[in-house]
């Protein structure tokens, strides 16, 4: 499993959070022997906007291939943002003023899903008020349709009680999701 703390807020310009994921995977794969892990078939676990960024790393177009890294064995995403919708121009002004280049917050994850996308386990909570403010129907449901349309092996859960920022889901309907997701990953990589 790969996890990292990504640059956020005022440190998130110039695609810094995506570069954080790249550096974490590079470091772990370069030191796999030292850490006693395999450099291939790794899983990435991430949440919320980090789920969108990690999800983009799993794509052919802007992710792992562009950095000469092995493809993830699975994406394990808790309430990932699919699109920042109306927040895109605000992020551009706050994070990258005057920059017209492609940035992670301008990308809609579902637009980058291809048949070669890694197996994915993703979930959302019906009472996730953060994603509600970002048009819930443009988040999980659209990502789910893209995975299904591209025949990507995946599992999708929508929980009644799993508000935003619950991570492992302790004390919510999502409790235990991480164990189920790890089992899904292990099944995919054999």
Residue ranges, per PLM feature:
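C-terminal catalytic histidine-bearing segment of alpha/beta-hydrolase fold enzymes
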Residues: 141-144, 148-190
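Catalytic nucleophile-loop/oxyanion-hole region of alpha/beta-hydrolase
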Residues: 9-39, 169-174
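The feature captures the conserved acid-bearing segment of alpha/beta-hydrolase catalytic domains
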Residues: 67-74, 80-86, 100-141
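Primarily recognizes the serine-hydrolase "nucleophile elbow" in alpha/beta-hydrolase
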Residues: 23-89, 104
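Solvent-exposed loop/turn segments at secondary-structure junctions
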Residues: 9-11, 48-52, 81-85, 126-130, ...
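Hydrophobic anchor at the start of a short beta-strand
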Residues: 42, 120, 153-155
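Short, small-residue-biased leader/transition segments that mark boundaries at the very start
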Residues: 1-8
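Mature catalytic domains of secreted/periplasmic carbohydrate-active enzymes
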Residues: 13-14, 69-78, 85-95, 99-103, ...
């Amino acid at each position: 499993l790969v996890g990292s703390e990504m640059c956020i807020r005022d440190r998130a310009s110039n695609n810094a959070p995506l570069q954080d994921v790249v550096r974490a995977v590079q470091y772990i794969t370069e030191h796999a022997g030292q850490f006693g892990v395999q450099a291939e078939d790794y899983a990435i676990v991430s949440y919320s906007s980090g789920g969108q960024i990690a999800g983009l790393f799993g794509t052919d177009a802007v992710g792992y291939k562009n950095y000469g890294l092995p493809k993830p064995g699975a994406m394990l995403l808790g309430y990932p943002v699919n699109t920042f919708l109306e927040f895109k121009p605000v992020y551009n002004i706050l994070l990258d003023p005057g920059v017209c280049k492609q940035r992670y917050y301008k990308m809609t994850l579902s637009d980058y899903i291809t048949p070669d996308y890694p197996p994915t386990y993703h979930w959302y909570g019906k009472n996730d008020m953060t994603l509600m403010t970002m048009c819930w129907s443009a988040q999980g449901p659209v990502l789910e349709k893209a995975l299904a349309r591209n025949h990507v092996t995946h599992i999708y859960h929508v929980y009644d009680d799993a508000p935003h920022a619950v991570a492992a889901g302790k004390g919510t309907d999502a409790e235990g999701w991480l164990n189920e997701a790890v089992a899904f990953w292990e099944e995919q990589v054999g």
